[in-house]
């Protein structure tokens, strides 16, 4: 088990104090370190995914009471996808608290998007089991607040607009490529390039990959409008 001080430090970053710290320890334990006497976070990940989904479904419904299902679904998906969970995990430096086996440690597991996203969902489940749905809901809404606002502001976002522009001209959908990543593991900066099948492209950078993609799409739309 992680030393108590390390769990306490992570609870400070998380903004939630566990009545049962063993739940948090389990949520932070990857299967590469599990054993018959020490479980991993896979079952908690399964539960946390459902808790996150319910909270986000409520959030997108509350944010736009007139929106139809067809417009709500993309917003919901943007909030619950693994990349979003991993971004939140990086913000609270969850990677530093993860308990990994030697193989995952040497493979850079603390930085891997899939592992971070899974662990974030497991932590949500641990909070749910420790303090109930209200505690889990408060945690998720606090950690996802900027994303919820951003998704609502970008209900018809630049990526969608660029894709529609391309489709209207019989072109393939735009492609997005991560061309660079800098900064510390817990606060990376992503640089992304968007490219049309006709060759036009633009690059942008941001602290979240989705934001970089949005900005690149916005810049390319502006470039196309000026032609």
From Swiss-Prot:
Top-rank lineage group of the source organism: Bacteria
Keyword RNA-binding annotated: yes
Localization per record: Cytoplasm
GO annotation (BP), single: tRNA processing
Signal peptide, first to last residue: none
DRBM domain ranges (all copies): 157-226
Domain RNase III: 7-132
Key words, A-Z: Cytoplasm, Endonuclease, Hydrolase, Magnesium, Metal-binding, mRNA processing, Nuclease, RNA-binding, rRNA processing, rRNA-binding, tRNA processing
Binding positions (Mg(2+)): 45, 118, 121
InterPro entries per the UniProt record, alphabetical: dsRBD_dom, RNase_III, RNase_III_dom, RNase_III_sf
Enzyme Commission number(s) from the entry: 3.1.26.3
Leading EC class: hydrolase
Residue numbers annotated as active site: 49, 121
Family in the record: Belongs to the ribonuclease III family.
Role played: Digests double-stranded RNA. Involved in the processing of primary rRNA transcript to yield the immediate precursors to the large and small rRNAs (23S and 16S). Processes some mRNAs, and tRNAs when they are encoded in the rRNA operon. Processes pre-crRNA and tracrRNA of type II CRISPR loci if present in the organism.
Subunit structure: Homodimer.
NCBIfam families given in the database record: RNaseIII
UniProt cross-references to PANTHER family, sorted A to Z: RIBONUCLEASE 3, RIBONUCLEASE III
Protein name: Ribonuclease 3
Species per Swiss-Prot/TrEMBL record: Jannaschia sp. (strain CCS1)
Gene: rnc
